[in-house]
Amino acid sequence: RIVHVVYGRGREHEVIEVSTFRAYLDNAAAEQVAGNEKTSRSELAGMQHAVDSTGRVLRDNVWGPQEEDAVRRDFTINAMYYDPQTQVVVDYHKGIQDAKKRTLRMIGDPATRYREDPVRIIRAVRFAAKLSPLGFTLDAKTAAPLVQSQALLADVPQSRMFDEMLKLLQTGHALATIEQLKKLGMATGIYPLLDVVVERADTPFVNAALADTDRRVGEGKPVAPSFLLATVLWADVRDGWARRQERQPPFPALQDAIDDVFDKRIGDVSGRGKLAADMREIWVMQ
């Protein structure tokens, strides 16, 4: 269970996430389903521990002790616990040692952990980009299976992949993330729309939007995915608009060009309606 506790009042309040510890389960003993979270929803309803045909964990929310909860974490530096009463840091996986060495190391066998949850591949890139200014680098064994494991992301629901892409681009380290993807040999293959962002990141127009997004996050200002994605995909809209104007009036041609871009580049993801409305407004104003 996860509970969000509001601490304080007014603008100065904090939201503290409180959760129970969860058990580390042997995935070899899990029940297997043929589909994913959506296609096997009714089948998963009665299961505590289930994986799909690739070994990706779909259900494993079981209470457990702190030491097992630590094993479930992805990186050693993300598996430390602070006891506010004794003021002691509980470190089961040498996270402090790795932090001093500025090393991002996966707990357990990296290839297995990526198979259990392929989104860890994206988290590895995001952490490496975020902490690179502090000198952190991925451990060689953690980085080695990344490219080969990319294919596992094809089984992750598109809405989750879209959300994870936004985390890469809207947490203040978009440019560093793109450099990290190139460095790791992962400039393509994670998510089609992200491929477009990486491909166009060196163009002055898109690069300025990425830099501005990083700047706003650094200044504590809000950022909107509609602005960044509208910038990245404007070339598609502009070119489609020009083609359609050969046989349509300008405004209907623009609307149809926008629809084409949404269908081709973004697809059916949660929240598309609001996102589409905002992006459409930006493009129409051009």
Model-derived regions: residue spans:
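Catalytic cores of the polymerase beta-like nucleotidyltransferase superfamily
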Residues: 1-286
